[in-house]
Amino acid sequence: MRKITYILIALVIFIFSGITLLLTTTGFKTNSFNSLINDKVNEVNPKLKLQLNDVNFKLGLKSFKFEVKTQNPKILINENEIDLESINFNINIFDYFNNKNPISRISIESKENSIDQLSNFINEYNFNLSRKLILKQIKKGNIKFNAEIFFDENEPNNLRYLLNGSVRETKVNLLNQLTFDNIKFDFLINKNFINLKNIDLIFDNIFITSDEISISKINREYEVTGNLKTKKTEININKYSAIINTNLDLLSDQSINLSSNNNLYFKINNKYKVEDFKIETKINFDELLTKSKFQDFIYLKNGDVFINYDKKKLDIALDSKFLFKNIKYNNSDSNNLFKAIYKKKKKFKCSSRY
């Protein structure tokens, strides 16, 4: 009898160990919890629906939670859908059987979706005319993202999220006036903050990069700060004077081979209009031609231009060498330094030393 008892105990231990090993390694597949998953998604928004395949469950021994993962699901609103790579979350077993919120966090990894597909989904999710008009400026592109959604145990409707990912091969046409091509960047987004990094784009055949642009939501406004850089490129600066609503009549209409480093700041108000635009720019140029009376016999070479612009002022400081067009007047031993300051609505002042 005792022998049979030992055998039964050993058999129970073996079966329990086998089940535990199965749950902690391979896990098992079921669709029994699909309704629970959809219920959690509905807490985000009742319009949202998930199209799920079988869900894989694995047991975490340390936390005593089921690690849940489903592959290739879709998230839908009416006819609009987003293709996902996976959805992952943990189910607290004790909370589940005590009728408490068993899921505190959901992790979502998307497949690559078109931005047009995502725009339609967002507009269906929460229609906003101003946002729709902005999204219509995006003509093409692809996006891939990861999302972390955190649920409050005591307030299920109070959730936090963190979104990160990348945008590639995007084209934006602002009001049919300014076109930006081959846009790519990485992003990090939460409720009140957007951070864009590793930005590359082409504007009017000018290659532009940025280490970082940050967008902060303050009340009903947005504050934007960032940095833009251009490599040495042939640029006609006067061509863009309309963008800053300033006539740069000091400069020649000829293109300039230059590079630039720009720090900018502006606000977007609750009507999506730009306010308080400010920019600080350093431009390095090879040769600079002006419309001044000196232009017929000298030109500026290997210099820097420092620009400080906001709606009240435009300050330009120039630090450069200058050369005579007639080379016999040039002295290779001299510095030929030229310094100038230009202020909007004030007189132009300059000084030189050679």
Regions found by a protein language model. Name each.
Residues 18-120, 132-142, 146-156, 194, ...:
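Terminal hydrophobic membrane-targeting helix
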Residues 15-19, 163-164:
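A short alpha-helix capping/helix-coil boundary motif
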Residues 81, 86, 184-186, 212, ...:
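Well-ordered beta-strand positions in beta-sheet-rich domains
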Residues 1-15:
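N-terminal Sec-pathway targeting helices
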Residues 78, 94, 177, 199, ...:
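Surface loops and adjacent helix of pleckstrin homology
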Residues 37, 41, 106-173, 185-194, ...:
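Extended amphipathic, helix-rich lipid-handling scaffolds
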